Amino acid sequence: MIPRVAKFNFRLLSLALLGIQVARSAITYQNPTDLPGDVDYDFIVAGGGTAGLVVASRLSENPEWNVLVIEAGPSNKDVFETRVPGLSSELRPRFDWNYTTIPQDALGGRSLNYSRAKLLGGCSSHNGMVYTRCSRDDWDNYAEITGNQAFSWDSILPVMKRAEKFSKDSSHKPVKGHIDPSVHGGDGKLSVVASYTNASFNDLLLETAKELSGEFPFKLDMNDGRPLGLTWTQYTIDQRGERSSSATAYLEGTGNNVHVLVNTLVTRIVSAENGTDFRSVEFATDADSPKIQLRAKKEVIVSGGVINSPQILMNSGIGGREVLGANGIDTLVDNPSVGKNLSDQAATIIMLDTTLPITDYDVDAALIEWKKSHTGPLAQGGRLNHLTWVRLPDDKLDGLDPSSGENSPHIEFQFGQISHQLPPSGLTRFSFYRHCSPIPPLINLYTVSRGSISLSNNDPFSHPLIDLNMFGEEIDPAILREGIRSARRMLSSQAFKGFVGETVFPPSDATSDEDLDTFLKTSTFSYVHGVGTLSMSPQSASWGVVNPDFRVKGTSGLRVVDASVIPFAPAGHTQEPVYAFAEHASVLIAKSYS
């Protein structure tokens, strides 16, 4: 158990001596009965996650508007571990929805854990903090799919740069050789740093990038729109060595015209007279407590995330008529696209025999160091520093390229610590090895298979049915097979000779397609970068759930802003795309009432 410490107050200090009046920060309420009865909210945001707090913060910049955020989990300020980058793993399962998928046929009937954050800030308070903008091809593809050129790379890059505050990390080492400053912003809300952990593995990777530059070239900055090669990792951590999330970067700077109700679930959005005008929210603290309704003067913005948002819409009568009817819900807006198109990334791991020194550390000592100076291993986002982005050659794709374009990788290697590991189930030979370094994980960035979210019943407190349809398309395991072979080539470089032996997971003799498919059937998992369950589409499209202005098709007074509207999982981690979509949505919403 990580020890609790006194909570810090990050509110802005008064500038009264300078003659400047600064508004107090957002007001947090622990129970619905604590909400003030004399406030009419212009906007109600259902979900205080990554996107929801961006929207609330930006809308609150108009002092005339009152904004209410309703979050199912606790405040991040009540959870010490959210502040310490190296303690992210301690947040699960306590502050997680702890979802489980239905059995996946192609994985031998295995059900997979599906982590989603349940606290203020959502996954930005809970995740691995990796900051990737993905490829310019992804954004140009989003623009084409949605019919909105505001999502093209050339249009969205200025949005991302304005929101970013890139700086040196808590070690204050120079950034030269780690990033390209010209593609970063320095005056935004979201703090970003490059990684600087000193480990022997770093030099071997950099030497390999020189030796095998055709497949693994060194890439100075993965966020310039062309993420191909071996690169230094960037993290949403501030220069004080603390996590930067939507809760710390956005919410803490708002005025007291933002009210936040925590530990309360939005159960559905209520329409006026069972029509298509949805401006009221219904919420409760648990299944046995009374349900309360509040009406927004202007709009309701659903920001529950890729799982919760479609569940909220379906419980509100928005979804496929057949699905809703089977769960005893009256259909108010018949849209079978709700909950469909779940796009995620399949992943596996590689472990290998190595004589390199372990990179484990004494967590207790590291925590003392972090509390004292906000430095040391717990101030870092990862124990090693590099990501590798690999684009497979055309002859390995069997004529089908699922990527967004030539600037886009198919595979990501994310390197982890070197440590003694327990053997995976059934792999007894593993115990004969000395140290073992995993690549946790090896990710198929453009997994083609599409899954779905459906209702298990009409109880909003029940978990929905999550079907990833993992390996529903043959190209998906094929790309992971080639990723394993690519990783083996990297680890067989001259730089690694004498330090790294054969892979032990999968076994070194697993080389054929059949052998690797058998391995993948038992080792593949979701990298929980799910998007697309309320996909955005052109205004006139007969498919999709939200229009390019984030309004839910067939309704008024209702928008969705979160990962669920992003049409497909991009070449990278989804945190920054969610921030960018939310920043753009905030501008559109504000302009609607200017």
UniProtKB/Swiss-Prot annotation:
Q: What superkingdom heads the lineage?
A: Eukaryota
Q: What is the lineage of its organism?
A: Eukaryota, Fungi, Dikarya, Basidiomycota, Agaricomycotina
What is recorded on activity versus pH?
Optimum pH is 4.5. the enzyme has a second pH optimum at pH 9.
Q: Which PANTHER family does this UniProt record tie to the protein?
A: GLUCOSE-METHANOL-CHOLINE GMC OXIDOREDUCTASE (PTHR11552), GLUCOSE-METHANOL-CHOLINE OXIDOREDUCTASE N-TERMINAL DOMAIN-CONTAINING PROTEIN (PTHR11552:SF201)
Its EC number is 1.1.99.29
Protein name listed in UniProt? Pyranose dehydrogenase
Source species of the chain: Agaricus bisporus (White button mushroom)
List, alphabetically, the GO terms of the cellular component aspect. Answer: extracellular region
The record's gene field reads pdh1
Record's cofactor remark: Binds 1 FAD covalently per subunit.
Major localization class: secreted
Known catalytic reactions: pyranose + acceptor = pyranos-2-ulose + reduced acceptor; pyranose + acceptor = pyranos-3-ulose + reduced acceptor; pyranose + acceptor = pyranos-2,3-diulose + reduced acceptor; a pyranoside + acceptor = a pyranosid-3-ulose + reduced acceptor
If you read the UniProt record, what top EC class would you report for this enzyme, in one word? oxidoreductase
Q: Matching InterPro entries, A to Z?
A: FAD/NAD-bd_sf (IPR036188), GMC_OxRdtase (IPR012132), GMC_OxRdtase_N (IPR000172), GMC_OxRtase_C (IPR007867)
Which residues carry the post-translational modification Tele-8alpha-FAD histidine, per the record?
H126
